[in-house]
A protein has these predicted regions:
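Small/aliphatic-rich secondary-structure junction motif
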Residues: 1-54, 87, 149
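Short, structured motif recognition centered on aromatic/hydrophobic residues
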Residues: 6-7, 25, 33-35, 71, ...
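Short, hinge-like loop/turn segments at secondary-structure boundaries
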Residues: 50-54, 105-106, 129-130
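A short acidic, glycine-rich active-site loop
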Residues: 54-70
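Structural beta-alpha unit
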Residues: 74-111, 148-150
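Glycine-rich, Arg-bearing micro-motifs that act as flexible, cationic patches
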Residues: 110-135, 150
């Protein structure tokens, strides 16, 4: 049924609430899991007379990317030990657009994610990223509500 499942993660425990569910799906359907992280850091834009330490900026970005890769590799290694095929996919830019683009590029049959909403209106119930994905996604979407995860 599901051969490729895209799993957006932001490193938070709330986002990780989806992990047991996709692990179960991967084992049941022998699906390939793609762990997605979208880097939202804006590009470096300077005013005409502004001075910035470019090397420090690039080093900070490199360290953040390395931290993200280490985080995702840890999850991938745990799953590989269980016989689950998993890879990472890194995007940069707005989160919703990154999820949509990655789902298309990876030909995901399913996007599985945890909502981060806190209650209130529709956007607050789901979270703004989840609401954006719901509006734009062109394939099945599995949502797990993670409001009780700290």
């Amino acid at each position: 049924m599901y051969r490729t499942i895209l799993v957006p993660l932001d490193g938070s425990p709330r986002a990780e609430a989806i992990l047991p569910h996709v692990e179960n799906l991967a084992q049941r359907y022998s699906a390939r899991l793609i762990l997605l992280h979208v880097d939202t850091a804006p590009p470096l834009l300077l005013e005409r007379d502004e001075v910035v330490d470019l090397e420090a900026y690039l080093e900070k970005r490199r360290q953040q990317r390395q931290k993200t890769e280490t985080y995702l590799k840890g999850i991938i290694e745990r799953w590989q030990a269980k016989g689950i095929t998993a890879v990472m996919h890194l995007e940069q830019g707005p989160v919703v657009a990154g999820i949509i683009v990655a789902a298309q590029q990876e030909q995901a049959d399913l996007v599985a994610m945890a909502s981060h909403g806190a209650g209130g209106g529709k956007r607050a119930f789901y979270g703004s990223v989840t609401a954006g994905v719901l509006q734009q996604i062109d394939r099945p979407l599995l949502l797990i509500r993670s409001r009780f995860v700290k």
